[in-house]
């Protein structure tokens, strides 16, 4: 079992794949270094002398600078490493020399649902979408009271509550309206009941205008203040929606029609070594089969955005990426916040030292394929291949945004563990084996076997593709089995 990994030949640190005790001789890539102190799993150890002010190199990239001299064997973390990040950056488009679409592979098929508009779906559910937080409990009761309608090919009746839709103005109000309308369009929802109160800011006419053309058999509306008994009215509508949803049956669909979101949360020092590279390899494999993937968490690209921007397929896509990234930075700066204060206490405990450290691991999920498009919050994926999406690092908000963009399912890597699931089935992928063993009720797939020396990234990526096809065909994720699913705007 390997003790550590030297990610790039030019790195001046290695990452402990397992806890390394003080005095242990670590041998990796022809380097022999004795640990001068205990090195926790996922944390960094210097393998070359690093002087005060000198860059700490990991992934072949500066992740910060040393704040004190460090000899080989020194633990390198928040006590002796500081970020190099500041504010906005003026980027230039320097296309990667090997920038080209990956070679195509014949797609496998999954057993999904074909909607009347031709889109593919992997679930056949009825959704209740409240337009305002005041009707949240009403929506929950409607779900509870009508579970008998979940029969035949209908796989669930769910509501996605939120506190918004009123007391919002301007951009906030527009974002709420846009996001909720995007959820109504999601193909995994065979049928949708949009639930209004009646007096909220987000009025029915506004919502219908945002929604655009829709199938009147698939989408129904109910305004609670307009009826004597909203529960009886909902029962009648839901029966109609169930009759509509029940006509869909699973059939073979090529994986080229899948849209998969890619997310990390509760990251640790192994995220960029095991789980995220596995997801990146999966992204390449799905793209070769004609499918689409979505990468977001823009603030967690800061410091590593160059990896992605040089892979934009053309200058127009590069300009959109530059605008998105600097727009997020300007948002922080305009609120008198620094751009680099992102890693959480759990991230740091797991070995992530700076935002650059976290970002270099985060972008591994993007694989090696060209970035084909950059899309806004609430906008749909329209281009095959790898897409970047405007969204924050927050787990709930970014996963909801990927669902709204049309992601059929989401791959969520984690080193610390999280039970959260978006409305789209959310697969939890552990970076380390101890987490997979401890939280078996949360984790769907373990890439810690890479750190254990049991499998390669190619092998875990193939296993992940196989699992995605099974989930797309109806196999439930751990979160689905627990009934976990929610949104945040």
What are these regions, as identified by a protein language model?
Residues 1-409, 416-489:
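Metallocofactor- and cofactor-centric catalytic cores in central/energy metabolism, strongly enriched
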